[in-house]
Amino acid sequence: MNVMINACFYFLDCANVSYAIRCAVSFAYCKPKGTSLQARPPNMPLNGWIPSENEFAWGLPGKTPPFEEGFDPLGFTNLVSLGDFKRYREAEVTHGRVAMLAALGFIVSERFHPLFGLPETEVLAIDALTMVRKEVPFFFEILAITIATAELFRALVGWAPPSFGTVAMGDTLQDDYYPGDIGFDPLGLKPTDMEEFEELEAKELNNGRLAMIGISGMVAQELVDHKPILSWWEDNFGLSF
């Protein structure tokens, strides 16, 4: 229970740090009165996408079989503006990417952890950070700086300066920013063909959604059984790793 509570507070703190960074960066980059930010001309596509309120999810990629028309039985996508939907998609893509890294790291770290003086035996991933901190007292401070740096870069790329007098200051994406596309592609893997780009983005969304469910399930399983996830799979499904 303590692990769950600490995890909840940790992620809440990360969310607050993320919001604070966006606000701070937005204030720092506000233009003086009388000047304007350069905006993308109307109807100019972002990665081949022109928003349309007549299409599912404003026309953003993500519709895959067996739901070729999109899956939203409760109609949530019909209740939000374009700006809000872009922000939700940005959040979904970002959380999905983090979850994919977390799911991979969760499994690998239990049997392969050569750093930080951890024991050579199999360890519980949910206990690994606590063990690391005993060896590296300032580990979480270093981790927080790393996360803040990544969030700072994302805020500089995609988030608009605040509108003074509104409630959601620093919580709006720029008009010419495509959700999730922060321009980080060192290997040049981003397709230039629109159809190929939409296909790969749909795959990323689906894998990210699965990873969010998967990492939640693995954490819950270890909290209940206190057994490394790979060993649990071996004992219950006869899998060998």
Task: Explain the meaning of each model-derived region.
Residues 1:
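Active-site or metal-binding loop neighborhoods of secreted/extracellular toxin and effector enzymes
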